[in-house]
Amino acid sequence: MKFVDEASIYVRAGKGGNGALSFWREKFVAKGGPDGGDGGNGGSVVLVADEALNTLIDFRFTKKYIAESGEGGQGRDMTGSKGADLEIKVPVGTTVIDEDTGETLGDLVRDGQKLKVAQGGHHGLGNTRFKSSTNRAPRQTTKGTVGEERTLKLEMKVLADVGLLGLPNAGKSTFIRAVSSAKPKVADYPFTTLVPNLGVVKVKKHQSFVIADIPGIIEGASEGAGLGIRFLKHLVRNRILLHIVDLAPWDEITPAEAAVIAVNELHQFSPALAERERWLVLNKTDMVPEDELEERCQSVIDALGWEGKAYRISAISGEGTEVLCLDLMTALDEKRELLLESPEAREKEKAVRALIDEEGRNRIMSLREKRRKAGLLLDDDDFDEDDYDVEVEYVS
């Protein structure tokens, strides 16, 4: 199944049923009163988060969703049937945007969470409603109103506590294999990771966190090079970013240069995302001669102007990964407690995520517009083989 994290759909709620014009007719009742019933309300369109889904690919093929209209009223004060609501299942982690106004309608972040995106039309009134002491035989009715319609943009972002950032072949996939049961593809060539991979890291009994590996970014990614920029948005919901630096790169670039490139591209994509809490992880210590290790690590720290702790690990052997995961669990627990106890912290987190969303979306749309003008992108979308047949799933 292809991994698709964006889609546009058209939704229209059902029309309300018209009110009925009717009078009671019965043997020996010459002038029965009005008995026209109301129409039924139109069905609404509702999105429902489903944790069993992990891609928006279905919306690439079915783009129109129309809810059922309400039925018209009938005589004998019979109300028309209400149109059934149309429920559309989307993956957990889907952001819903009104494509015409740019307004974010909501985030579906919990399994079973619902979001009404188009309100059904209101029912029309039958002539019974207009009976009065001065008008015993009203012929007035009203029609049902039309339902709301919208063009929606759906954006799916994977839900993870920790996100991995780095250049291709930095060892991100090897790291996620080492600390969880996830088994992303690993090989000695760039862009082995083509879509996000998720793994559940179990630190202690009943203590775990989710980690996300996205395709590596390269120099010029913010201008459209490589695969990484379209996946950087998946880091929006991460509480901590792990910047993994390869101490033994296979090409001519130095570890210090690689570290600076990743940070610069992150800033270009979203300054707010670049300000997220970020930890430095120096990987492949086992592949560096012992007499060169200290100097190589220090070169990265100096190039970044890094003042915090720098973790030294070997993802392939597991050296240093246990301490790193324990520290991550402690930090994440502290962040969860703060969000639970402080409304101000929750509001701040919400505002930061919204800002990252806006900055990232604007950047991606700007690049797509440039590609369209250059004739590199079709008018409908960019659905191509870059998506690949890989599923994103939580593996514990």
Curated annotation (Swiss-Prot):
InterPro entries: G_OBG, GTP-bd, GTP-bd_Obg/CgtA, GTP1-OBG_CS, GTP1_OBG_dom, GTP1_OBG_dom_sf, OBG_GTPase, P-loop_NTPase. Mg(2+) binds at S173, T193. It is found in: Cytoplasm. Residues 129-144 have a biased composition (Polar residues). The keyword Magnesium applies. SUPFAM superfamilies: Obg GTP-binding protein N-terminal domain (SSF82051), P-loop containing nucleoside triphosphate hydrolases (SSF52540). One of its GO terms (molecular function) is GTP binding. Its cofactor is Mg(2+). GO terms for biological process: ribosome biogenesis. Residues 1-159 form the Obg domain. It comes from the Bacteria. It holds the Pfam family MMR_HSR1. The keyword Protein biosynthesis does not apply. One of its GO terms (cellular component) is cytoplasm. Its main location: cytoplasm. Residues 160-333 form the OBG-type G domain. An essential GTPase which binds GTP, GDP and possibly (p)ppGpp with moderate affinity, with high nucleotide exchange rates and a fairly low GTP hydrolysis rate. Plays a role in control of the cell cycle, stress response, ribosome biogenesis and in those bacteria that undergo differentiation, in morphogenesis control. Belongs to the TRAFAC class OBG-HflX-like GTPase superfamily. OBG GTPase family. Monomer. This is GTPase Obg. It comes from Marinomonas sp. (strain MWYL1).
